Structures are given as C-alpha cells and as structure tokens.
Amino acid sequence: MIKKFDKKDEESGSGSNPFQNLEKSAVLQEARIFNETPINPRRCLHILTKIIYLLNQGEHFGTTEATEAFFAMTRLFQSNDQTLRRMCYLTIKEMANISEDVIIVTSSLTKDMTGKEDVYRGPAIRALCRITDTTMLQAIERYMKQAIVDKVPSVSSSALVSSLHMVKMSYDVVKRWVNEAQEAASSDNIMVQYHALGLLYHLRKNDRLAVTKMLNKFTKSGLKSPFAYCMLIRIASKLLDETEAGHDSPLFDFIESCLRNKNEMVVYEAASAIVHMPNCTARELAPAVSVLQLFCSSPKAALRYAAVRTLNKVAMKHPSAVTACNLDLENLITDSNRSIATLAITTLLKTGSESSVDRLMKQISSFVSEISDEFKVVVVQAISALCQKYPRKHSAMMNFLSNMLRDDGGFEYKRAIVDCIISIIEENPESKETGLAHLCEFIEDCEHTVLATKILHLLGKEGPRTPQPSKYIRFIFNRVVLESEAVRAAAVSALAKFGAQNDDLLPSVLVLMQRCMMDSDDEVRDRATFYMNVLQQKQKALNAAYIFNGLSVSIPGLEKSLHQYTLEPSEKPFDMKSVPLATTPITEQKTEIAPAATSKLPEKLAPSRQDIYQEQLAAIPEFQGLGPLFKSSDPVQLTEAETEYVVRCIKHTFARHMVFQFDCTNTLNDQLLQKVLVQMEPSEAYEVIHYIPAPSLPYSQPGSCYSLVRLPDDDPTAVSCTFSCTMKYLVRDCDPNTGEPDDDGYDDEYVLEDLEVTVPDHIQKVLKPNFGAAWEEVGDEFEKEETFALASVRTLDEAVGNIISFLGMQPCERSDKVPENKNSHVLFLAGVFRGGHDVLVRARLALADGVTMQVTVRSSEETVVDVILASVG
C-alpha cells in the first residue's frame, strides 16, 4: 500500500511523490523477486510500477539490464492475478524497444489474445502488435482479422488501433484487412466505429478517389458515433482544401448538414471546419456563426469557451459576420470564467464600432489584473488590431497600454505591449511623443534586456526627429549609468544618433561619449570610441554610413566570410562586397506580436533562406567561382498544379551570372525519370554556359537540376530577358507497386512555361532607417530625373504598390503607406544593385485624371541609374 499523505505534506510538496528518489540499480535488484516461487502479485506489481516510472522519467536502461529485467518479468505470466497481468502488458510495451529477444513472449500474448478472458484480450493485442515486426505479422494476421470484427468492443478497438500503428511498418499486410475494417465501421459501438473509420482513411489517404468514395458512402448511410462524424468532417474539410473545390461541392453540403446534428461536439466541429476554410465568404459563414451564437448562451462553460474562441478567430478576417453576435458577446463580458470574458471583449473590440471602444476599454480595465498573462497578450493583440482600424482612438489605447505596462507581468506580456505601442507610434505620427514618453518611463525600471535594447533602438531612430530631442537624452544616459553591458551598448548607439542628427546637441553628446569611453565593458568602450571619432568629423555622409543606416549584410554570412579571411591571411583589406546582403533588413522592426508560446529566445541567429542557398550552391563544384550569392527569388511555378510533372524555378543572381534552380517532382508512379535537365533558350544576349542534370527522379521524390547563365557584359542595361524552357529526360517505365524500373528507357521532353528575368532579380531590398541621410551620403553625382504619366492607374495606393513590385526595392520611412484624403505623396525606395551598388529612388506622385510621377534616382554607378529609368519608362 502507498502511504497516505496529509494535505499539509501535499501542499509543501515533500513526500507527495513516493518514487521521487528511486535509483535504477536498486529497482533492478528488486526485480529479482520475479523469479521467486510462489509469485507475490502485490510486491511484483509495485516493482513493475517503479520500472515504468523510471522509463517514463527518461532514465536510460542499458540493453543487457533491460533484457534481464524483461526475461525475469516473463515468469509473471504464470500468475492469474488480473492487475499484475495487465501491468505486464504495459511493461512489455514500454520495454519493447530497449530489450533484446522480446518476441519470447509472443506465444503467451497470442494465448491471451485468443483466450476467453475479455479483460486480457484487448491489452494483449496492443502489447503483441508493439513487439511484432514485418516478418512476424503474417503469423498473427488471422487472429488480427478475427479481433477486428470481434463482438467485444474493447477487443475490436484494440485491434483497430494497433492496425493503425502497424500501417507505417507493414502497409501492404494491413491493407488486406480492409474488409474487416469496413465491417467494424458498421458497428453500433461509437469507439469501434470511430477507430474503424480512422484505419480506413489511413489506408486510403494517398488515393483521393478512394477517399471520396468512402466519404460518399458514409455521408449517405450515416454514422452512429459522434467521434466518427468529427473525423469525417475533418477528412471532408481536408479534401475540400486539397481539391480547391468550391462551396457548391457535396462535401461542403455534408459539413453544413452536420450543423443540424443532435450532438454538440459534431455541431461545433462542423462550425469550426467552415470557419477555417480559406476564401469563405460572409454569406457562407453565416450558418456556422449562427450555431456558435447559440453556443454562447449554453450553460456549459466548455461550449461557451469554444464558441467565443472560434468567433474571435472569425472576427480577425470577417468582423462584419460576427456583428450579429455582439449582444451575446456583451453578455459574456460578465461571465464568471475570466478566459471567456476576455475572449468576448477582444472579439467585441474587433467587431465593435468606434463609439463602443471607450466603454469596452473601461470594462477590460476592471478585471485585466485578474487574468493570466496568456490572455493579457490576447487583449493586447486585439487593441493593436483596433488601433489600425480606428487610428483616432490611439490616445485612449495608449493610456490603457501604459497602465498595463506598469502592472506586473512576464516577458511575453510586456513584449506584446511594447510592440503594440511601437506600432501605434509608427502608424500615427501625432502619437509619437506620448508613446516615447511611456516607453522612457518603462525602461527606467525594466528587467528585460531584450525590451530595453529594443526601446533604446527606437529612441535613437525616432527621438532625434521630435521637436524637443534633448528631453530623451537623460533617459538614455541613465541606462549607461545603471544597466547591464548589452543595454549600455545600445544606449551608446542611441546617443550617437542624437549627436549625428542635431548639431545643437552634438557638444553634449560628445561629452557623454567621453564618459562612456571609460566604461568597464569593452563593447561599450569600443562603440563610444568609434562614434566619438565619427561624430568629431562632422560629415553627413559618414554619419549616414556608420551611424544611421549601419550594415545591411547577412550576419551569418559576415561571420563565415570573416572566419575564412582569418584562415587565409592576405595583404588586401577585407571586402564587404564579398558578403551576401541580408534578405530581411537587420534594422527593420517588425511589430507583429508573436504567440505567447515562443517564450524562449533563440541563442544564435538562424541562417536565412539565402544563407542556406549560398551554402548549397557553394557545394556544387561548377558554381564555386561565381562569388557571393547576391539574391534568390521566390519560387516561380512553371507547370500547372495537377500535371504529370511539377516544376518550379528559383533564380539565384550573382555578380556576373545567374543560376536557375529547377525543383522537379514526378507525380507518375509508373515512371522513373533519369538525367533530368531544363534546356533554356534566351530571347536576349544572355548565354547558357552549363547544365547540371538531376541524376534520378523517382515517383513523388523532388529533385533539383541547374542551369548556369552568363549575363551580357557588353550591355549592362540588359536586365530583362525571357527564356523558353523545355524539360528533357530519360524515361524508364516501372512497376507502380514495387517501383522496380525496366532495363530499357527512352528519351522524352516536356514543354514548360516561359521564365522571365526582370529588374527585381538584379536588386536586393535594403532598408535605410534614415532615408534623408542615405540620400545625402550617395550624393548627386549620378542623379537623374524623369517624369512619367501613369494613365491606367486611378489611385495613389495602386501607384505605390505597382512601383514597389515593379522595381523590387524596399520602401523607407513608411512611405508605402499613403495618408487618407491626399492628392500627392512621396515614395522613398532603397536597394542594392547587382555588384554592390547602392541605389535610391524618390518618386513624387500627384493624383489628377491619372497619376503623374516624377522619379529621381541616385546611385554610386551611372549605369544603375540608367537601368532604373529605362525600366520605368
């Protein structure tokens, strides 16, 4: 017997776990009792419990000791004690993968599986299937078939679930049990029917036609199990998504009919499936929303929670569809369950009118301190969405957020608030000073280094442009005096930006920099010394290059290049142009709030998609002399989705070459493709110099082939080209079941869509946080200006979107957002042209009958300016 502990022990935590200090060696020593005669079921049961506890705690058992314990345990089958026997089954399952010769218990388990004791049969089947491999499965196949159609539900369910696990190991054998599974699917028992449907689906899931037939059969005949109905809804929903069938499909009609089912679980599953369907209109959502509305007034808390949580998701995309539920949601604000109340309010914030915002904020503030951090983050996300919807309400939101910022809370909660305030500042320039003041107050007592450095970065970026920049200096310098090394270093960088932008503040900033040069940390001292020297030069170009805009290279790429440079000493200085550019600008601040689950911060910066491509291409000998990878495009589809071969292309741009990576998938199971390459015919002076074929392309296994193209040297302005593409390969027919190919093959080809190279393939986006400084830094030596009429464009928003996508450059200073009711706008774009040449574009837009655009281009290379203007023209 396990000693009963009193409540006091339980609360203190001492003694609440009788197995807390178990030692593996002692337990294995105790296991020798299994060999004693007569068997003591009670003691053996306790020892087996200890072994399972140790295994579940992750204790490592060596193969020898595990096998010895396993063999000793097999003697316990001589006992007729029911509890001990079932504990043996559990132990067999746990030790199946770490012991040798576990098949020794096969005969004992088979005997129990076919015996008269129903209480043994189900667990024996599960244990037997755990230790059975492909070679032994046929020996028990007859028993498994009988068990699947057994009249005892627990036996039938055990056989079905075990079969489901064995599908991964022996698909071909389990496939022969389909008839028995279909018979079990007509069982009156709800669990047997559910498990039978699950097995049937997993046997057929790779055959869309078979799944469709199965769905048609069960949707017409009906089911008794609500669990099976839920699975059927999920299968139908998945099939709808894969086939991109419209809402006129019989499958959608079936899901909609489940909204009228008698079982609440089925009704909710159907409503949830409709809500999560892509491209669902408000009209198609209406029946699902009506059902969820009814659930909002259910006496069951779980139903109310499910309904309001799902409505919350609907409100993100279709707020108008949820408006009809506002009254029910308002009733849930006072719900005794705080999670339900929070979700109700955040849903109302997404669907409510501008006039209801203040009232809702007041209601939230009354209980926000009582809810968990996870739900506080949900509230902050709703407020962030509301700020974008009703920008005029930013002051009310800002006050509410600042109060929340003062409350106690974890890192994720505080980060969500800080991100929300930053997004309000960026969306509403008039709220900048208020927001910065709240953030300054927060960093005075901030225990999170990540947040403090983020806010200091924002102060350095936005503070110098405010009417009174001097008031932020005190808050920043306080961090240098009081905080950790990382925060002090960030504060030094922020101070430098004030000195670089404001001549009046420069003397004061230089004095503070001198103090920072005496810091105990070398990172802080180095930064202070560096900025001190740059600021003393009083040159705007230097300030722009080294203080405002910083590096725009890939950090993992820079690390690798510097390491390579140190391994091979050279008299030449390190060339920054040898480092790949960052695909996502380092300085870009994303204010999207991350989910609460991601509380662990990455210790090392993960390599970007482009860094991975750089490594993959560098491993191919033919591409090793091309230099650093400049840019990789998004994949371009060259075939339709449902064709026999699926081909997509990724364009990799280098200084003087382009590599075209063709990712090919063979969707025919009766063919093996070999020596696969894509032949390219250019329309311009581009020259294909090498093909690297994919050696083999088996069914459903993607492979890559490459084409190397030289860019025209004699005409650097030739940035656009169209390639006609043909896939060529050797076909070998093969057996669809075994995949065994014929000895002989034949050559064949497949015409692909044309592939275009355009201006964005030669330009990498680079964010310039201070565009004005970058504009001055590049200078007007190669500045050119032209005016264009965009006759077909009707709005400034459309014009801005078209220019950005056409040039493939990075919008700066949030100039991609056009203010409301404006007839003119200025768009700032920045990028780096192939070869490492900075290029900046200023486009002045005016709206009249169409849109008139005055484009000014600056670059460090005249050819680049000509390329941009020629492409726009």
UniProtKB/Swiss-Prot annotation:
Keyword Cell cycle: no
Domain of life of the source: Eukaryota
Alphabetic keyword roster: Cytoplasm, Cytoplasmic vesicle, ER-Golgi transport, Golgi apparatus, Membrane, Protein transport, Repeat, Transport
UniProt-listed Gene3D superfamilies: Coatomer, gamma subunit, appendage domain, Leucine-rich Repeat Variant, TATA-Binding Protein
Disordered as annotated region, ranges: 1-21
Assembly information from the UniProt record: Oligomeric complex.
Keyword flag Protein transport: yes
Chief location: cytoplasm
Protein's membrane topology: Peripheral membrane protein
Function: The coatomer is a cytosolic protein complex that binds to dilysine motifs and reversibly associates with Golgi non-clathrin-coated vesicles, which further mediate biosynthetic protein transport from the ER, via the Golgi up to the trans Golgi network. Coatomer complex is required for budding from Golgi membranes, and is essential for the retrograde Golgi-to-ER transport of dilysine-tagged proteins.
Subcellular location: Cytoplasm; Golgi apparatus membrane; Cytoplasmic vesicle, COPI-coated vesicle membrane
SUPFAM superfamilies for the chain: ARM repeat (SSF48371), Clathrin adaptor appendage domain (SSF49348), Subdomain of clathrin and coatomer appendage domain (SSF55711)
GO cellular component: COPI vesicle coat; endoplasmic reticulum; endoplasmic reticulum-Golgi intermediate compartment; Golgi membrane
Name this protein carries in UniProt: Coatomer subunit gamma-2
Taxonomic path: Eukaryota, Metazoa, Chordata, Craniata, Vertebrata
